[in-house]
Structures are given as C-alpha cells and as structure tokens.
Amino acid sequence: MWGLCKNHFPSNKIQVQERNKALKPKKSGSEHKTKQLFPVFNCKKKEKGVMIRFAILRNANTSLLSARSICLFTQAPTYCHVRLNTLNKSITTKRNSLTESKRHVHDGKHFFTTPHQQQQTKLGEIEEGHSPNIKGEDLRSIGQAITHQRNKRRKQIWSAIFGGIFGVILGYSLIYRVIYLKEQSFLPLFPSSKIRKLSTRDLKKVDVNQVQKLSKLRVLEILSGHDMIKEQYGVPLLDKDGNSPTLNEFSMWCEDQDPCVTGIVMEPDDKRDSSHTWYRIPFVCKWRITHRPISIRGTIDDLLNRIGLETSDLFEIISPERVYGSFKYEYPLQGDSHALHLWFHGEIELDDDSLIVYNGKYHVDVKLQEIDLFRREKNGQLIQYVLYKNEAGDK
C-alpha cells in the first residue's frame, strides 16, 4: 500500500513543497474578481502541506480507487481558502436576496407594505364580504333578504302595538263596563257627518205632515207678495190646471250641533224590549251600530267634576246669539242631551217650465231659509231666480 501512495506522500521537505505547488488550486475568474473587490484578504504566507500517513493492515483488502480518494482528500484547507469560500457564500446570498425582493415588487404600493401584508388584507376583505369575485346578483339577493327581514320585523312590531291597543280598549269596554259593571258602553269606530237622515225612531217623534203643510203655506204667502210672481203668474198662485199648487217632493233631515262619530253601543243582555234593533251575543251582551255626537264642553265638564271643579269656576261662555233660531232653542229629540237642527226641503211645480224649490228649519214653527224659481226660457236656457233668502238665518 505504501508503494501505491508514495507519489502522494513524499519523504523529504523539497518533495513536500513541490507536491503542494502541484496540488495548489488555480485562480478562477470569480476568485480573481473577489480579490480585486476585497484586496485586504490577499494571502502572503506560503501554503504548507500536511503529511498524513495511513497504516493499513496487510491482510486488509483495499481497492486502488479507495486508496487514491484517501490521498486526494487528505489535503487540508488553508486560511485563505476558508476565507474566500465564506466571502463567496455571502455574496451569493446577497444577490439572491436582491433578486427575490425585485421579484416581489410589482408596483409602487409595495415600497411601504410587503406582499405578505397585502395578502393578509385581501383575505380580511374576503372574510368581511368585500370580495370582488362576488356577483352583483348575489349582492342584490342578500340586500333583498335583509330588506324583507326588516319589513317583516317592522310588521310584527306594529301588529303587536295595534293588537295591544285593541285588546285594552275592547277589554275595558266589553269586559269591565258591560260584563262587570253592567253598564252601557260606546266604542267609536270612525267619524261621521253632522247631517244625517232621521231614523224610524226619530220620525215617530216628529209630525212630518204638519211640517209639510206649514211649509207650503209659508211659501205661498211669500210668493203672493213678490212682484215678479204677481206680474207673470198672477195672484192667487195656481198651477197649469187652475188648481192650488201641490208638493212634488218633500224631505227632512237633522244636523247635529257637535261633531259626530259612528260606533258600536254595547249593553248587558237583559232581554228587555226596545225600539232599536239589537244584535245579541247570548249570555254576554247585545250591540248595535249608531251615531253619537262628541260634546267637547261636556267632556271638559266631566273631567272637571271628577277632580271637584266646575266649568263656571274657571271660565264662563257667553253666546251672543241668544235669539230664536240658535242651537239653544232648536228642537231636542227625546232621549238626547244635545240640540239638533231639523231641516226640510220641498218642490212645487207651477207649470212644465217652472219649479219652486225651498228649504228651511223647523222648531215649533216653520222658518224658511231660501226660495228659488227654476224656469226654462224660450231660448232653452235654465235660469235660477232667487225669490227669497234669509240672510240672518243660520244655515
């Protein structure tokens, strides 16, 4: 074995130096550039070889290639070699870092933020629902679902509010007033007009035939003294057949003094006879729909009486119209605590082209408000002539 390796392991110092020169690596282009960039690290000391001997047993079987590889790798590195290798590694790492940073910079916004931070921001936007990949149809469907849910919630709230109010009112009117206290209760529904027709019950208390006769006499009396009627129709006033004029149309209605409402009247089911038509709920109550006025002054009086006061203690209302024809002296229907105006309307036909129309109020006597003559002239025009009008009357 020693004979095979004697060329690689010289015996004297001169041979060692020559061997080191032969094994000294040649300068490459990269190393030459490195020495130019870093001249401080130029090695001036001579390289020294290292003599290593291997003791191999005689009986051991070792191939020639193994022995040659051992001889080649026994050359120990010098200080300059180690330093050059370190510098080469540092330069390559710097170049790699610069190339990687250049690859990451796509536009100017990465000078102050790294791509990693931008990726985290995009992920956060996607989690919040601001992803650009979401379609417009999906956004509209989401918006419609939110709007539908809000409307549904709003309807539930309003239904609960109105249901609670209706339950409180119905419970007080029906359960407390009618069933518990055994009293009459009125539940208002909606406002109604002051003017209404006389009911069957009201007509029983008013003599309509008497009002009709009195109104006709008052109209003929006023027309007989009118100059136009005297000249064109003559006195006494007669119809086309030469008879006294007759009423073709006559009607009456009432007008309440206060605002009116339409509502439901409820009473205990006592099965007593009544002039009104009632609808019954067996063993609970009876009810009907009616009109009732709302007396503001009466409501104020009731509130003051509950706290021990009266209206006269605070103020006094003085009406300047304390004369016949005001509401104070109008016809009160039986069973009502408020005054009413009883109005009437009539038509008297004089001939085919002439018609007398009048209206007024009734209390104890008839009080006419207006008398008009409707006549069709020869040219075919229908003209209204106002023959009488009560300017001081309340309409």
Curated annotation (Swiss-Prot):
A GO cellular component annotated for this chain's UniProt record is:
mitochondrial membrane
State the UniProt keywords alphabetically: Membrane, Mitochondrion, Transit peptide, Transmembrane, Transmembrane helix
Q: Give membrane topology per the record.
A: Single-pass membrane protein
Where do the TM regions start and end? 156-176
Q: Where in the cell is it found?
A: Mitochondrion membrane
Give the main localization category: mitochondrion
The record's comment on protein family reads: Belongs to the AIM39 family.
Please identify the protein, giving its name as recorded.
Altered inheritance of mitochondria protein 39, mitochondrial
Q: What organism is listed for this UniProt entry? A: Saccharomyces cerevisiae (strain RM11-1a)
